[in-house]
A protein has these predicted regions:
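Structured alpha-helical segments in the cores of large, soluble enzyme domains
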Residues: 100-105, 201, 279-289, 317-323
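Enzymes and membrane/adaptor proteins characterized by extended Gly/Ser/Thr/Asp/Glu-rich
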Residues: 76-96, 104-229, 251, 256-270, ...
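Sec-dependent N-terminal signal peptides of Gram-positive bacterial secreted proteins and lipoproteins
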Residues: 1-24
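Phosphate/pyrophosphate-binding betaalpha-module
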Residues: 232-235, 239-249, 275-290
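Catalytic PLP-binding core of fold-type I/II PLP enzymes
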Residues: 318-331, 335
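Short helix-capping segments at alpha-helix termini
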Residues: 136-141, 240-244, 323-328, 382-385
Length: 408
């Protein structure tokens, strides 16, 4: 009995011990847990395309500098004491060097180019030096132009201080020597223009000489036949090109079949659109997009129903020249100091009218101060949007870059 009692007591102790052991379990080692962040794939931020050289230049320009690029002036216009009659007088002394006061005026009116007349030229060395002065005086190098058509209008070849080849007239060259002669004329003229520092020539004459009563064109034109005129015009332009000179085809929409002198009044061409396409416009179709076309103060009432000069006509500059004929080069006005303009419009009206028509470059305003201020004010008050100004200036800058007038 004692043995049984002892065994019973031992079992009881064993159970109690087991129960106590369950109340104090051995801790279990587990691996530490870490919070892992999974990267989320996101699209890279959109990047702006890099600016072109012309856009970089534009982005650093002041408003005055932008407006200035629109103007090609005679250097005499920098002498603000002179009026239009003084500047235009061929017998008065012209500006032949860039003096201190003229350099100061350029800071106020940082123009895009200059055109030199005979009164601005005394001899070969002076001309070379003067063009260099004009080029170096501006942060954005200017167009340096003259009228060297060959024949009657030749500022250098007809100057007594120069011994240069002379041509009787484009009409005579075309009739006698054909396209080869026109090309050689362009090469010769372009060669000496480049030598003296020019980069642009207001030539060739792209008018078709169809009206014997025309007082200003005549044999300045290559031919009375539009097909021949177109071929000869292209040949001369190629010669200028090969000499490093920018050709300017003039005077769109055609000055050949007019009886008026646009220096004095608006010239009128009475032809219909179909007639113009078959004649006057053929030579202008030869102009390429790296070249220029000069628009004349010529009205086409059969197309526009008005006597508005083409220079101020959106339907002719933008509608016909840009859109219908597809020309994408620079469009420059004829002189805004001519009677066709000054008798009917103020300098500011003429400048803004030409820009609104679609012209890029404003040639020789009657009054630089008034024309410049008119454009500047119109941009500042929003009547001529700055975005439109930027578009025009960008075209000018690209053109100067293409022709290595400025560096990228």
């Amino acid at each position: 009995m004692k043995i049984i009692a002892a065994l019973t007591a031992l079992c009881t102790l064993t159970v109690l011990a087991a129960g106590c052991a369950q109340q104090a379990p051995i801790p279990v080692q587990t691996a530490p847990t870490f919070l892992t962040t999974v990267p989320v794939q996101t699209a890279p931020p959109a990047t702006e395309p890099p600016l072109s050289p012309a856009e970089r230049l534009l982005s650093g320009m002041t408003l005055r500098e932008k407006v200035g690029q629109l103007f090609i002036i005679r250097p005499d216009a920098l002498d603000l004491s002179l009026d239009a009659a003084d500047i235009d007088d061929p017998h008065s002394d012209g500006v032949t060097t860039l003096t201190g006061p003229l350099s100061e005026a350029l800071k106020t009116y940082p123009v895009g180019g200059f055109v030199l007349f005979s009164k601005n030229i005394t001899d070969p060395q002076q001309l070379t030096d003067f063009n260099a002065q004009l080029r170096d005086a501006l942060p954005i190098a200017p167009f340096l132009a003259t009228d060297e058509e060959g024949g009657l209008v030749a500022r250098l070849a007809n100057h007594p201080a120069f011994s240069l080849p002379k041509f009787s007239s484009p009409g005579a060259v075309g009739a006698q020597f054909g396209p080869e002669g026109a090309h050689d004329m362009g090469m010769t003229i372009g060669g000496y223009l480049r030598e003296y520092g020019f980069n642009m020539d207001f030539a060739p004459i792209a008018d078709v000489n169809t009206n014997p009563r025309n007082p200003v064109i005549g044999t300045r034109a290559f031919s009375s036949d539009p097909v021949q005129a177109a071929e000869l015009v292209r040949a001369m332009a190629d010669g200028l090109w090969q000499s490093g000179i920018i050709p300017v085809f003039k005077h769109f929409p055609g000055h050949g079949d007019t009886a008026e002198d646009s220096h004095r009044s608006i010239a009128v061409n009475p032809k219909s659109e179909s007639e113009l396409l078959e004649c006057e416009w053929l030579p202008f179709l030869q102009a390429e997009d790296q070249e220029c076309i000069m628009v004349g103060h010529i009205a086409l009432p059969a197309l526009t129903g008005a006597l508005t000069p083409a220079t101020l006509s959106p339907s002719l500059v933008t509608g016909v020249l840009r859109e219908q004929l597809g020309f994408q080069g620079l469009i420059i006005t004829d002189s805004l100091a001519m009677g066709a303009i000054t008798k009917n419009y103020t300098p500011a009206e003429a400048a803004l009218g030409a820009l609104n028509a679609g012209c890029d470059l404003l040639l020789m305003p009657q009054d630089l101060e008034k024309a410049f201020s008119g454009v500047l004010s119109a941009v500042e008050d929003g009547s001529f949007p700055e975005a439109r100004l930027d578009q025009v200036v960008l075209r000018i800058l690209n053109f100067k870059l293409i022709h290595h007038i400025i560096d990228g």
